[in-house]
Amino acid sequence: NGPATLQLFGSGPILNEALRAQQILAERYQIAANVWSVTSYNELRREALGVQRWNRLHPAEPERVPYVVQALTGFDGPLVAATDYMKIVPDQLSPWLGNRLVSLGTDGFGRSDNRQHLRRFFEMNSESIVAAALSKLSRDGNLDPAQVKAAMADLGIDTEAKDPARA
């Protein structure tokens, strides 16, 4: 597979979906991914805000770097963050992760009878994580859009499904 070109964040029970997505990416699409277990997006944000405050109050000192930025140093490529909370939870890291972040979460109201259907409905199951990663690679110019379209079909992604946040 070579060096990982994707970073996958998973939290709580969704970590298993990220691990499965890593396996699918490697086996079906020959794309390596690192999986990161995020125990608290809120704590990562608090720490980053604390660093930001310190930097603001100490302009003559060398800038400090938030932990989330330090941890990702040397790990390139898009970052797909999946959670069983709303997308805004991982989105709160976007000031430090920039445009490489794609957040997946449970925005809206589910009409699912089990967890597997719920995760598929909200597009944060392993197949949706793979689809988001491939789409971001394509948008960044690193993967042919035709390959992504074929992968969406292979993964059973309904590209015309109603947005779960508005369903």
Residues covered by each model-derived region:
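Thiamine diphosphate
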Residues: N1-A167
